[in-house]
């Protein structure tokens, strides 16, 4: 979906989604959300982004790659991505593989978003000291960018 500004510039519309809990079963919530994304794809929305949250009522899509692979299979045009993968929770090499696979499954429609996370208890539940979050993020981002942009990956950390 595209609109124009007063001076003629394009505005591309997208959706940011938490896939939050409601009174329905998780299966029904996912089915409803996937139908919504299919509709957005048909209506020419530019992109669909999903949050990653853990152990909160904010989201049941706590595995963005898995959820977005279902989105990719049900759509053909809309761009998609996580906003954000919580880098302190991931092994960077494993995430590189997931990102590449998701980009292939979506036929190049992946929009990659990464971040540190803002809710300390979410990362703490995975044994990550929130005080170490910045350092873990910085190192993971370095490895991720090398892995996605260089022919070989060589990193000691």
Question: Which ranges hold each PLM region?
Answer:
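Internal, glycine-rich beta/alpha segment that forms the wall or movable "lid"
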Residues: 2-10, 91-157
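Short, solvent-exposed loop/helix junctions and linker helices
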Residues: 61, 89-92
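Short, solvent-exposed loop/turn segments at the edges of secondary structure
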Residues: 62-64, 75, 82, 107, ...
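Active-site nucleophile and cofactor-binding loops and adjacent substrate-binding regions
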Residues: 82-90
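Glycine- and other small-residue-rich loops at beta-strand/loop junctions that grip anionic moieties
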Residues: 60, 84, 133
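Positions that flank functional sites
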Residues: 55-56, 86-87, 118
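N-terminal beta1-alpha1-beta2 module of alpha/beta enzyme domains
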Residues: 1-80
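Structural motif
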Residues: 51, 83, 113-115
């Amino acid at each position: 979906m595209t609109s124009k500004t007063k001076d003629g510039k394009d505005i591309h519309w997208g959706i940011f989604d938490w896939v939050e809990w409601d009174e329905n079963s998780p299966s029904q919530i996912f089915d409803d959300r996937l139908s919504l994304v299919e509709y957005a794809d048909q209506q020419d929305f530019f992109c669909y982004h999903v949050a990653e949250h853990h152990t909160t009522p904010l989201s049941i899509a706590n595995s963005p790659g898995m959820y977005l692979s279902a989105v990719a299979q049900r759509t053909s045009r809309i761009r998609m991505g996580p906003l954000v993968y919580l880098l302190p929770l991931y092994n960077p090499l494993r995430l590189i593989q997931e990102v590449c696979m998701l980009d292939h499954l979506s036929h190049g429609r992946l929009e990659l978003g990464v971040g540190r996370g803002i809710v300390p208890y979410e990362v703490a539940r995975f044994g990550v000291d929130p005080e170490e979050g910045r350092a873990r993020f910085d190192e993971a981002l370095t490895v991720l960018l090398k892995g996605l942009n260089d022919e070989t990956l060589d990193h000691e950390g």
